[in-house]
């Protein structure tokens, strides 16, 4: 019988604790039905010593180490190979937790030394543990991956004082978590700006980062001229995002300029994707 990580974790816990009774769930129901493990009494599965022996053998067909040895199922495949027979069965994504950077006028500070990454079309992935975080001087977080790859085409729209920043992709899933972790350990004096779609969802992303540490949001300098009928406006996208207005409106301590932008976006039903924001000219930086 082939078992997944969830089933193996459940079996490992029972073997570690030498548990004789467990609540029925999908895993134990399957093991009882397919392998006649345990006896069902009411809503529990009762395990004998011989049942535990069978479970230990079954566990050993998937895992090299004894059940008493704890390992991280989210580790990379090289680390997982020390424990799992099938190293591909882990939960880790190869690049899932790495931070993706690009730059024009900045070096990427690593613990092993500074790295030159300012080449057109070049992005660099690095784990947080290898970053010399204390040497990051300025950071711009970008929502869109394509914008990161093509940074050399549009960076001059960023205010001059921000053009020597490191540019970081916000990512999705585990990438987002890594970005949050970076923000938590950045030096307090390091300015951070967030450049997203010009819409409620983008403003919400920036606002959530601001809960971790103070950040600014980059918006089109011409934001006041963007109305519902603007050729780059996506009204239907605004409708999909209307749920975010309540959370944003309830944010305490929001700056007056940020309130004005939020009011404008909501009143005019604005949703301009970042690629289209890029067509609108210079950006301005607004403290949240």
Q: What are these regions, as identified by a protein language model?
A:
Residues 1-189, 201, 206-288:
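Nucleic-acid enzyme cleavage-core boundary/entry regions
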Residues 195-197:
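Terminal interaction module
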